[in-house]
Amino acid sequence: MAGALVRKAADYVRSKDFRDYLMSTHFWGPVANWGLPIAAINDMKKSPEIISGRMTFALCCYSLTFMRFAYKVQPRNWLLFACHATNEVAQLIQGGRLIRHEMSKKASA
């Protein structure tokens, strides 16, 4: 069973459909977009003082909008959807870190 699944996957990777997918914007658009969530995840190690609330909010709205787009477009672009879902979660975490930081500053003042 596993051998048949591997064989089927290998046949698909060698197919013209897969090559066409690799050369389409349905593949390269999300690949380029992965820079946003990677940067947000990397910024989680940094001080919350550098977080911009406005930019975090804008990126949350952007990712929600394009998650909907990736779902509605035909054929559905699951790679783009996953990219923006990851970015949405990362930005919400960054927003939470910013709020926690601002609250602790007010509490200590």
From Swiss-Prot:
One Gene Ontology cellular component annotation held by this UniProt entry: mitochondrial inner membrane
Mother cell cytoplasmic side: which ranges?
42-52
Sequence positions bearing N-acetylalanine: 2
List the InterPro entries: MPC (IPR005336)
Could you name the domain of life of the organism this protein comes from? Eukaryota
Relate the protein's function as given in its record: Mediates the uptake of pyruvate into mitochondria.
What is this protein identified as? Mitochondrial pyruvate carrier 1
Source species: Bos taurus
Lineage at the top is: Eukaryota, Metazoa, Chordata, Craniata, Vertebrata
